[in-house]
Amino acid sequence: MAKIFLSAGEASGEHYGALLMAEISRLAPQTEFFGLGGTRMAAAGLRRVVRAEDVAVMGITEVILHMPHVYREYRKLKASLRTERPDLAILIDFPDVNLSLAAELRRLQIPVVYFVSPQLWAWKKWRVRGVKRNVSRMLVIFPFEEAFYRAHGVAADFVGHPLADLDPPTVTREAFASENGLDASKFWVGLLPGSRARELHANLPPMLETARLLGPEYEYLLPVAPTLKDPQVQALAVQAKGAGVRVVHDARAVLQHARASVVASGTATVEAALIGNPFLVVYRVSRITYAVAQRVVRVAHIGMVNLIAGRRIVPELVQHDFTASKVVERLRPLLENEQARATMQSDLRTVGAALRVNSEGAIQHAARIALQLIPAEQSPRLQSALVSSWPVE
């Protein structure tokens, strides 16, 4: 029986971690999992040494305030590795913790798979040296990342993006309208400011002003996860309702049925591209964070869709350029000009195709590669089963 250590400290990574555990369990029944994760991974069978919610802090101030506690939890993880000696470690995103764990795992001579690369290609390229030294295999979800890591001598494989494996939302426009009290005769505009309180505070006000400027001929939809209980988030939702914006609970359905959307930089931009919803990317952070980013970030675009395409196929409004008037200026063609819409949708289909490797799926692909790194002497029957079940291209 194989024993695998996993570490995922953020919501998206934890979601991928739970899916990965399910696929590994299918391929290698009775595999034992332990490590760092959230409630989804616990439900999938992870024996939690550290809870993700106890170490997930954001922003420079929060990191400084919580440093002693985070360090204590990190020491727990290191101690568990020395005691349990897993056959394999799978680290998922969360670079502030996982890159340090990778160094400890190398010292213990435990194979390390890193799934979902930290964005070292955008900044902190110097940290690639540590990845080369400490990570056995980097499994990336964006196509350009494979070439970046291989150029730096890192064994890397593009496995596809997990979101590309999802089926389109099944809810019809009529059903979604009925469920949420929407006017189905109007075009809908999606407003996706991000899911964290900090992102909503930065991005929602200009989005609400955008709705005011565009006027009542459109219906404006703000998806907010029903599980978000943060009082600040709830207050912002109330503010949105007061501005005539409808608060709903299904972001993917919004992207499926909106005429066009305004989307904060992040995972939602990839979802919009895969669904084929015309959109523009917005991004706003604190002045200090932006000043630092200007000095260290070395990429031509902030939108992942544009990075994948290698050119700007989706408009970007960053920091001071992110104003309601400029959003309206960029959004109107996507609402009113059929040629502009068709051109963007064609470009988005090309990006979507680039996020898929084969029919197997990203999670399945990642699980098979990861299990191959378990030394054969540890589980010879597992290795034999993997070889016989590997898909023929």
Predicted regions and their residues:
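Nucleotide-activated sugar donor-binding and catalytic core shared by glycosyltransferases
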Residues: 1-393
